Amino acid sequence: MKSSLKPVEKYAYSIFEIAKEEKKLDLYKHNLETINSIIEEVPAFFEAVGDPARDRNERKQIVIKNLEGEIDIYLISLIDLLIDVKSIKLLKKIVLKALDFVNEALSVKKVLITTAYELTKNQIDRLVQSLKKKYACEKIEPIVVVDKSIIGGLSINFESQVLDNSLKTKLFNVVKKTN
């Protein structure tokens, strides 16, 4: 890895290398997703951990008390290190970049599905199965976004391809043809 990388990429790549060496890519994927969920769903937790007004050891104890046994020790050590170097604010970016490295190693492809209404688990599973066949992929991870502005149907973004079957696009194309 190049030495000109930014700290986020260095930390993320180090996490990835540990996961690879330990043969724990799947575990780290799960742990990184867990940390990301905590950051998004319980922001007060990382606000407390990042609060410079709190004693550093107190902040580390908060991490250990709440994450030990749930998250691999190397990831807890990373959080401790970020507390020490006053860079805990980088954690989310590091986690997302490490997930990119891990997903690439696991051959996980992400697909963005935009729909006008909430899809059921069954509908999502069927879409994923169809995409696996169409693109000859074993692992596809769907990201479902509800956007009422597309009116109906759905739009699928997979790598650099867009399959837009939204009602909004269909109507736009009809208007475009009539002009």
Curated annotation (Swiss-Prot):
Record's subcellular location: Cell membrane
One MF annotation (Gene Ontology) recorded for this entry: proton-transporting ATP synthase activity, rotational mechanism
Record keywords, A-Z: ATP synthesis, Cell membrane, CF(1), Hydrogen ion transport, Ion transport, Membrane, Transport
InterPro entries referenced in this protein's UniProt entry, alphabetically: ATP_synth_OSCP/delta_N_sf (IPR026015), ATPase_OSCP/dsu (IPR000711)
SUPFAM superfamilies referenced in this protein's UniProt entry, alphabetically: N-terminal domain of the delta subunit of the F1F0-ATP synthase (SSF47928)
Keyword Ion transport among UniProt keywords: yes
GO cellular component: plasma membrane; proton-transporting ATP synthase complex
Domain of life: Bacteria
A Pfam match: OSCP
Protein's membrane topology: Peripheral membrane protein
Entry similarity comment: Belongs to the ATPase delta chain family.
Function statement: F(1)F(0) ATP synthase produces ATP from ADP in the presence of a proton or sodium gradient. F-type ATPases consist of two structural domains, F(1) containing the extramembraneous catalytic core and F(0) containing the membrane proton channel, linked together by a central stalk and a peripheral stalk. During catalysis, ATP synthesis in the catalytic domain of F(1) is coupled via a rotary mechanism of the central stalk subunits to proton translocation. This protein is part of the stalk that links CF(0) to CF(1). It either transmits conformational changes from CF(0) to CF(1) or is implicated in proton conduction.
Protein name per Swiss-Prot or TrEMBL: ATP synthase subunit delta
Organism expressing this protein natively: Ureaplasma urealyticum serovar 10 (strain ATCC 33699 / Western)
Gene: atpH
